[in-house]
C-alpha cells in the first residue's frame, strides 16, 4: 500500500521524488510506491500531459468531424479574447473536415471550400491562432510568409514552394497533403503599391497575388520529389490543391483610414456623428470592413474573391493583456515561473506589476507580441544573478520594478522568520 508523506522527519531518513529529485521537505505531498516516490508537483505535471494528449486527439463526432464547439474549446485554452475570430476559424475548420468526409458520397451538389482572411492589428493573435490550430487538428498544416514570395522565374520563393512545404509536413503522402491547411502570414505586404493597375512589373506584390489565385482556387501543382530543384527530365509529384484550405492573415496598416474615410463620406449631415480614427480603436474600425476597402488597400479583385470569409480581430486592451500574461496554459508568467522553479525559487508578480507590463505593451503598440521582450528586460538581471546566489527562496516583482524605480525583492530562506513579513510589506 502506498504511503503519503507531509514532510518532516530527520535528515537521515529524507525521501526524494524519483522523477524531479525534490526532497519531501520541498513539496507538499510525497506519494510512496514500491521502491519509487512521486511528489504532488510531478503528479500535476503528468495530469497536464494526459490532458494535452486528450485535447490533441480531440473528441470526434459520429462522422469523425470535430465540432466547432470542440475546436473553439481548445482555442479558448490558449488564446484570450477574439471570440468572433475563433468562431469563424472553428466553423471553417469544421466545414473543411466535413467536406472531406462527405466528398466520396454521391451528391449532385458540390461543396466549395471557403478560404479565410484574418484582419487585425499587430500582436492581436492572428499567427498564434494559426499555430494553435496546427497543434489540435489532424491534417497537415504549414505556415508560409507572403513577404518571401515572388513570381516564378524571379529570385525568391515561388508559390509552389508552399505546396512543397505542405507535402513535407505530410511526409510526402500526397493524399494527406491534399487535405491540409495552409496559413499565409503577412498577406497585406503583397498588396500592389496603388489601387490603379500598374504598367510596371510588380513581382513581389500583384504578381504574387496572381500566382496565388490558382493554388487557392484549385489546381494540380507539380512538385519536385524530396524537395529537389526542378529540371526537364525530372519526375514530378502531382498535388491537387482543390481541397486545401487557405487561411490568410495580415495587420493591414492604414486600412483603418480607408474604412474611416468611406464612413465619413456616407455620414454627412447635421445629425451625423463621426468619430476620428484616433478616437476609435483599430479593432472597432475593422469591424466595418467591406471588400471594397481591401481593393483600395491594394488587393486585386480576384484575390479578394478567393477569400469569402473575413474575420476581424480586435486590438488588445490592458485587461486582455493581463489575462494573456496569466491565464492561458502556456502563459508567459507561467513560463518564467517554471524557469525560476528550476532554480528552486518562487517567482511572484504583484497585480500592479502585471498591469504595468500590459500598459507598456499598449504604449508601444506591439500587442501581445511585445510582452516577452518587456518581461525579459525586467527579469534579465535577476536571471543573471540567481544561479550564483544561495538561499534565495522567492523573487517578488512589483509595479515599481516594472517602472524601473526599484529592484526585484529577494526573500532568503534563512531570513524568513526574522524579516520575511517586513520584506513582503516593502514589496
UniProtKB/Swiss-Prot annotation:
Q: Where does ATP bind?
A: 121-128
Describe the family membership recorded for this protein in Swiss-Prot or TrEMBL. Belongs to the ClpX chaperone family.
**What's the encoding gene here?**
clpX
Under the heading PANTHER family, the entry gives: ATP-DEPENDENT CLP PROTEASE ATP-BINDING SUBUNIT CLPX-LIKE, MITOCHONDRIAL, ATP-DEPENDENT CLP PROTEASE ATP-BINDING SUBUNIT CLPX-LIKE, MITOCHONDRIAL-RELATED
Q: How does it assemble?
A: Component of the ClpX-ClpP complex. Forms a hexameric ring that, in the presence of ATP, binds to fourteen ClpP subunits assembled into a disk-like structure with a central cavity, resembling the structure of eukaryotic proteasomes.
* Name this polypeptide is given: ATP-dependent Clp protease ATP-binding subunit ClpX
Sequence positions that bind Zn(2+): 17, 20, 39, 42
Q: GO annotations under biological process?
A: cell division; proteolysis involved in protein catabolic process
Q: Which NCBIfam families match?
A: clpX, PRK05342.1
Domain ClpX-type ZB spans what residues? 5-58
GO MF annotations in UniProt:
ATP binding; ATP hydrolysis activity; ATP-dependent protein folding chaperone; protein dimerization activity; unfolded protein binding; zinc ion binding
Q: What does this protein do?
A: ATP-dependent specificity component of the Clp protease. It directs the protease to specific substrates. Can perform chaperone functions in the absence of ClpP.
Return the InterPro entries for the record: AAA+_ATPase, ATP-dep_Clp_protease_ClpX, ATPase_AAA_core, Clp_ATPase_C, Clp_protease_ATP-bd_su_ClpX, ClpX_bact, P-loop_NTPase, Znf_CppX_C4
Per UniProt, the keywords (alphabetical) are:
ATP-binding, Chaperone, Metal-binding, Nucleotide-binding, Zinc
- Asked if Cytoplasm is a keyword of the record, the answer is no
- A single Pfam family it belongs to is ClpB_D2-small
| Coiled-coil zones | none
One term under GO cellular component: HslUV protease complex
